[in-house]
Design a protein with these regions (language model features):
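N-terminal glycine/serine-rich phosphate-binding loop of ATP-dependent small-molecule kinases
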Residues: 1-108, 122-123, 154, 235, ...
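Phosphate/ATP-binding catalytic cores across multiple sugar-kinase/actin-like superfamilies
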Residues: 64-72, 256, 394-422, 470, ...
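Glycine-rich phosphate-binding loop of actin/hexokinase-like ATP-binding domains
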Residues: 96-122, 132, 155, 159-197, ...
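Glycine-rich phosphate-binding/hydrolytic loop that grips phosphoryl groups
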Residues: 254, 258-262, 310-323, 396, ...
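Acidic, glycine/GT-rich loop-and beta-edge segments that sit at the periphery of enzyme/chaperone cores
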Residues: 312, 317-320, 324-332, 336, ...
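Activation-segment/catalytic-loop signature of the eukaryotic protein kinase fold
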Residues: 352-453
């Protein structure tokens, strides 16, 4: 069947993911390969002490991203889609969107990037003997209650970004179990009922009488087919009126779940590292962790299997800022360099730097970094007077810095918990320049790192796969579907740690840890 016919006969599957700086849509056909895409750039705002996006930002971004996708389809295939086999929505996990009974947003959306819930996160973690990070939705809700915020008495529902968009498209307040695991702790089928009971008692004692099961979105596993695009939802996504209602929507998932799906990392002893504006590693566990740690989140795969996640708020933003500086210099010189070529030039040059970066250390903290103990962000760098300061070492240190805080958390899993992993797959923008960040990550973690041909597709492709699984999965588990239908014969490259690189990265980390006190002082 020609691709035009597939588009017209609902043999295509659409994934849309709301990342920190880009909203991306990827369309796949029944071979599960991307055939079209569209994107929309956006940025969070820092307003009144809160990192946020407005509802207008969200709606406009969704519509412009979808319009870019349909234009790409028209340009390539000469048709405009009126339907799809299924649609899936993904977004940055966690955060806090609180609504009243009439669906009015009560306070501006508080994104995952905020580190303003320390008291709530600490008290909940102690109550449950389970790490509740500051960015989780339940921490935001409890902190608002502790703060005595006026809006709390009006709360009827809270949601995440992906859950909110799914609700606008379908009228259903539901999320996938992976997304749910960043709202409140889950077990294999839904929210942990023992924990719900304990937290309900605490919230009630603080004057919040609504039960959490009424406030939180319901939970579904991958493959569930319980929501469909409404007429209002179709008009929201496509104001031209071309898109018709009735398309199935799979459970909305977070960027962790789509990353696992996009890297075929949903079975125990597999893992992946997603690296963009933030960076996080996810290792699917074959046994529960013995302890709980502020640096380690326990979330789940889209099927509910437990996952240890090390999440760091900061990854590529500071690196991007330095690339921009050199782009400005090139422009001033009268020899402008295209952005992709500039990235490649600087990344590949970093490979020629000293393994320890010549005693140059970079902190890439634009916002707080709890894994490294940094409450607030202050990008900074330092070097020793006898160090070797040059462009290659500066950029090598910049790239090392994108994964240094991650390394602190991963050491807990590998050394204290003896977690074993058979493969780690990297994906996201940091890996677009072949063999650079991939090699540094292998050196830093001391294990092989693979990057697939689809690494740049990232979460939107993973979300499209989850949408396809809803329709095409049949009786297969998600891992069986991915292994037999999607990743069979997938082209990938694997790099092993190099001795010099690993030793140099270890030296960089010693300097990094020694300098953290200066980072803390600068942020006060």
């Amino acid at each position: 069947m020609a691709i035009q016919e597939k588009i017209q006969n609902a043999k295509t599957y659409l994934g849309i993911e709301f990342g920190s700086t880009r909203i991306k849509a990827v369309l796949i056909d029944d071979t599960f390969a991307p055939i079209a895409s569209g994107s929309h750039e956006w940025q969070n705002r820092y307003e009144n002490g809160v990192w946020t996006y407005s509802l207008d930002d969200i709606t406009t971004g969704l519509q412009q991203c979808y319009a870019a996708l349909t234009e790409d389809i028209r340009q390539k295939f000469g048709v405009t889609p009126t339907t799809y086999g299924a649609i899936g929505i993904s977004g940055m996990m966690h955060g806090y969107m609180a609504f009243d009974k009439d669906d009015n947003l009560l306070v501006p959306f508080r994104t995952w990037r905020n580190t303003i819930t320390e008291q709530a996160a600490s008290e909940l973690s102690e109550l449950l003997s389970f790490n509740i990070p500051q960015r989780w939705s339940i921490a935001h809700l409890y902190q608002a209650i502790l703060n005595g915020e006026e809006h709390v008495r009006h709360i009827a529902h809270i949601n995440t970004l992906a859950g909110y968009i799914h609700y606008r498209l379908t009228g259903k307040r539901q999320v996938g179990i992976g997304e749910a695991s960043g709202i409140f702790p889950v077990d294999t089928t839904g929210y942990n009922t023992d924990y719900i009971k304990k937290v309900d008692e605490v919230l009630s004692a603080k004057g919040f009488s609504v039960k959490l099961t009424e406030v939180l979105p319901s939970v579904l596993n991958a493959g569930a087919k319980e929501a469909f695009l409404t007429a209002d939802g179709a008009k929201l996504l496509d104001p031209t009126g071309t898109l018709q209602p009735g398309v199935p929507l799979c459970p909305p998932e977070g960027d962790a779940g789509t990353g696992m799906t996009a890297t075929d990392s949903v079975l125990p002893r597999t893992g992946n590292v997603s690296a963009g504006t933030s960076i996080f590693a996810m290792l699917v566990l074959d046994k529960p962790l013995k302890g709980y740690y502020p640096e380690i989140d326990v979330v789940t795969t889209p099927c509910g299997a437990p996952v240890a996640m090390v999440h760091c708020n900061n990854c590529s933003s500071e690196l991007d800022a330095w690339v921009k500086i050199f782009g400005e210099f090139a422009q001033l010189s009268g020899h402008p360099i295209a952005k992709p070529a500039l990235y490649d030039m600087l990344y590949y040059h970093a490979l020629t730097g000293d393994p320890d970066c010549g005693n140059t250390v970079v902190y890439n903290f634009l916002s707080g970094e709890p894994v490294a103990g940094a409450e607030n962000g202050r990008p900074m760098y330092f070097r020793t007077p006898d160090g070797k300061f040059n462009l290659a070492n500066l950029f090598r240190a910049e790239i090392y810095s994108t994964m240094a805080a991650l390394k602190l958390g991963m050491d807990i899993l590998f050394e204290k918990e003896q977690v074993s992993v058979e493969k780690i797959t990297g994906h996201g923008g940091l890996f677009k320049t072949k063999g650079v960040a991939q090699q540094f990550l292998a050196d830093g973690l001391g294990c092989a790192v693979s990057v697939m041909k689809t690494a740049g597709e990232g979460g939107a492709w993973g979300m499209a796969l989850l949408a396809a699984y809803t329709v095409c999965g049949g009786e297969k588990s998600l891992s069986e579907f991915l292994d037999s239908e999607v990743f069979v014969g997938m082209e990938s490259t694997t790099l092993q740690p190099e001795k010099n690189g690993a030793e140099g990265f270890a030296e960089f980390m010693e300097n990094y840890k020694r300098g953290l006190a200066a980072q803390y002082a600068a942020a006060k």
